[in-house]
């Protein structure tokens, strides 16, 4: 069970990162559950920071 939960959270973080790189708004987060939403937003923030610092185009 823990592995499935971790994979789901990692997937949410990965999708958030991709959304951030593509310039999507954080308001477009598809998740309603607080824990999963926080992982998605964390990925989104990481991508925005990477993009602003010039690590990604």
Swiss-Prot record:
GO cellular component: cytoplasm
A Pfam family recorded for this sequence: RMF
Keyword entries, A-Z: Cytoplasm, Translation regulation
Annotated Gene3D superfamilies: ribosome modulation factor like domain
InterPro entries: Ribosome_modulation_factor, RMF_sf
Main location: cytoplasm
Residue ranges of coiled coil: none
Keyword Cytoplasm: yes
GO biological process, one term: regulation of translation
Compartment(s) of residence: Cytoplasm
Region (Disordered): 1-28
NCBIfam families: PRK14563.1 (NF011162), Rmf_CrpP_fam (NF041886)
Family: Belongs to the ribosome modulation factor family.
HAMAP family: RMF
Role noted for this protein: During stationary phase, converts 70S ribosomes to an inactive dimeric form (100S ribosomes).
Protein known as: Ribosome modulation factor
Gene designation: rmf
């Amino acid at each position: 069970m823990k592995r499935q939960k971790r994979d789901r959270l990692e997937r949410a973080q990965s999708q958030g990162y991709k959304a951030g790189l593509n310039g999507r708004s954080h308001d477009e987060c598809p998740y309603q559950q607080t824990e999963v939403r926080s992982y998605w937003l964390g990925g989104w923030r990481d991508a925005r920071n990477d993009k602003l610092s010039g690590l990604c185009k």
